[in-house]
């Protein structure tokens, strides 16, 4: 079932979450161990992230260094198939621009179609850690809107090779939205312009980056509606779990903590106290969002479901 069908057919706020593929060498059981505690809340879909290659330098026998590309968290498509088989819940793989040619993207989408996976979250993706800015594949897409256009074209039966009659795909496309704007955008108006381009290209729903101030989400939704973005906008929440999150989350994701949350976090002396504040704040956020009848609340678990379970018990 498509994500948009889940959203349109429910009168109540839905529950969904995102997981990471395990580090290479770990078993699929580590994924199931993270999902099992959350199944009692009846998630309608589960997102699985995709991670770009990284580069390391390995010394060769002659003493020279060789640059090698590695993927630390492979398995996105296989995990999606395993989730759908084991839990009978729809899985949403992330599909990114970085590192893929258009043909590789087309082939990946064909694989997904053959597996019965008909939802994708289309993202540009981050730059490689060793690069200061995002660099697309020379034969790939530079922006998420271009990736969405390609998926939409395939939904219309238009493939890269267009001299034969080809079967249309049937993907439901999700896109990312940023209540505090994407850090590369000049301002919020520009960011919303690009978001509308993604919706016009075929995105049927939006999932937001994490935020900790619900007012910013509400203002973001209002701003979207004012410029004609009328698709469902799913709020994304991330429970704060440890002391490092106090500095890491604002720095990496370019987001702010509201004053009330900051004051509580600064009182904490250890990770246990931080996690409890994160749970309490997550419950408060979730209850307010649910009271406003948002279509779904999407939780970023980072494959650690403890805090999300504690929040969901009080909300769903």
Locations of regions flagged by a protein language model:
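Catalytic cores of alpha/beta
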Residues: 101-114, 190-194, 219-222, 242-248, ...
